[in-house]
Structures are given as C-alpha cells and as structure tokens.
C-alpha cells in the first residue's frame, strides 16, 4: 500500500492477506482481522515459514486475516526517512491507510490485534483519533506505563537518545533479539516515554494520550502473561484498566487455569499457545464477526 500520507512519498506498507487454498477471488473470506507484530520482528511472528501460527489458525476458523508489517520490516521497504520513523507516524498515517484499504477490499472494517509494540501502535492510533470505525481490537503484552529504572537517573534518557540517534538504528540480529532492525525514532520514542518524567504522548505535538485512552469506546481484549518479564502482567493490566471503553482481560497463568505461566513470546508462539490461547482469541473475535 503506497498511501502518500504524511511526510515522505517513499512510504510503502506491506499487507499480506492469508487465505485457504481453493478460495476464489472475490469470495467472502469472513470477518477481517489485522495482526501487527512487535519490535525487531516481522509477519513471521504470526505465521512461521512452515505456514503455522496464530494467523493460519484464525484463517482456519473462518477469518479473513491480514498481516501488517512496519516500515522497513519484512516485505515493507525502507522509506527514505527510515531513521526518523516513529510509532506516531505508523499510527497517524500507515494504520489508517491499511484500515481503509482492507475495507475497500473486503467490504468490512477489520479488527486489529497487536503484540507488544504492535499493540502500542494500535493504541496510539485509537487514542490519537487517527483510526475510526473499528469493531474491536486486542493487545498482547502491551503497556506504556512501566518506568524503566535505568532511565530514572537524571540525564540518562537524553544521553541514551543521543547515542541511539548517532547509531540511526538498532540491529536486532546483532543484539540477538530478533531478525529486524528498529529505527532511532521508534527507540527514542520509547526512551522518552519511559524516562524520568516521561509520558505517553504524540512527539509531534506533545499531546498526552492517556486522557484520550480513558475516553475511547472501541471494545478491547487485553491479554497479559503471568511470566512476562519484558512487559510484566501488572503493568499491562494497569494500562488495560485505564481504558475507558468496553474491555475484557485475560491473564495467561497457572492461577487462571492455564498449564503454565506464559511469557512475552510464547503467549503467541508455540504448541501451548496453539492449544490454550489461540482458541480464546478466536472465540472473542467471533462475537464481533456479524
């Protein structure tokens, strides 16, 4: 999708539509659902090279599944201003363009599901008022309220942001945390938000987003994992409970009847997630599929 929205005409976003073999062009594929990956990864988070993942499962359950990839990730090419990409730009320009494109193709507005940073992008689009007509959205291991203790020291945040800006991007393979890079703009947004006196806001205007989060009305499924050390459950739950619209929460842990305390990645990926988590997500989506 080349949407020509916002600064820079070079932006193109890859949207991959997943379907069952034998489905004819134009045939009703069911209720559309968009999956948004987190940082340092791509659509492979939802669909493995062997064709298995939450994406293929939801297709089998009758949903019309689309995979959204951030700028410069997977099949989305790098734009000319790659190092200055931000969550705000994704939320303000890319998600609304994809939302409208899917509506044009399917005749329905999709539900959006995001993991970690993917959830933050969706939450920013909703709180910023950039994307409307959503039937529902879900977030997995997403929060914007946990203070990063290393960044609470005065000047730690500005120094870290200066170093990241100098590097222009962080290499996920070099850091052994994923197959993709992240631009300085996205990293610095995170550092500013979680530093001393930081808050969730739009960098371009300084507008605080939590007040709008508290007044939003789209139905939310907030999923947290009891064993998550990246975005701990208590912070995800705190963020979800601030939301003003209809919401359901799901804590993936032994105390709630699950086989284990799920963690940040295996809440989505693996046989345990396939058996215990994916069906819950499918059932929740089914309520909005009419």
State each model region's role.
Residues 37-38, 58, 67-69, 110-121, ...:
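Catalytic nucleophile loop
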Residues 20-77:
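Short, surface-exposed "cap/lid" segments of acyl-processing enzymes
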Residues 104, 108, 112-113, 117-205:
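Alpha/beta-hydrolase-fold enzymes
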Residues 84-104:
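Alpha/beta-hydrolase active-site loop
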Residues 248-290:
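Catalytic active-site module of serine/aspartate enzymes centered on a nucleophile-bearing elbow/loop
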Residues 218, 231-242:
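Short alpha-helix in the alpha/beta-hydrolase fold that links the catalytic acid
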Residues 216, 222-224:
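Short beta-strand/loop motif that positions the catalytic acidic residue
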Residues 1-26:
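N-terminal cap/lid segment of alpha/beta-hydrolase-fold proteins
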């Amino acid at each position: 999708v080349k949407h020509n929205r916002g600064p820079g005409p070079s932006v193109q976003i890859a949207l991959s539509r997943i379907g069952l073999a034998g489905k004819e062009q134009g045939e009703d594929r069911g209720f559309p659902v968009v999956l948004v990956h987190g940082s340092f990864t791509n659509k492979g988070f939802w669909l493995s090279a062997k064709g298995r993942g939450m994406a293929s499962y939801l297709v089998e359950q009758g949903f019309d599944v689309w995979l959204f990839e951030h700028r410069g990730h997977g099949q989305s090419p790098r734009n000319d201003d790659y190092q200055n990409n931000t969550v705000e730009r994704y939320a303000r320009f890319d998600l609304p363009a994809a939302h409208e494109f899917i509506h044009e193709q399917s005749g329905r507005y999709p539900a959006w599901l995001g993991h970690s940073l993917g959830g933050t992008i969706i939450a920013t689009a909703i709180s910023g008022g950039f994307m409307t007509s959503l039937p529902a959205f879900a977030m997995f291991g997403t929060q914007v309220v946990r203070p990063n203790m290393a960044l609470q020291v005065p000047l730690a945040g500005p120094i870290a942001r200066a170093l990241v800006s100098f590097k222009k991007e962080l290499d996920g393979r070099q850091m052994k945390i994923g197959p993709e890079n992240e631009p300085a703009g996205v990293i610095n947004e995170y550092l500013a938000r979680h530093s001393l006196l930081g808050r969730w806001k739009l960098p371009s205007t300084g507008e605080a987003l939590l007040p709008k989060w508290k007044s939003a009305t789209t139905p939310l499924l907030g999923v947290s994992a009891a064993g998550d050390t990246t975005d701990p459950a208590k912070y995800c739950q705190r963020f979800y409970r601030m939301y003003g619209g209809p919401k359901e929460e799901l804590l993936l842990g032994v105390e709630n009847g699950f086989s284990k305390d799920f963690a940040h990645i295996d809440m989505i990926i693996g046989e345990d997630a396939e058996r215990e988590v994916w069906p819950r997500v499918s059932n929740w989506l089914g309520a909005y599929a009419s």
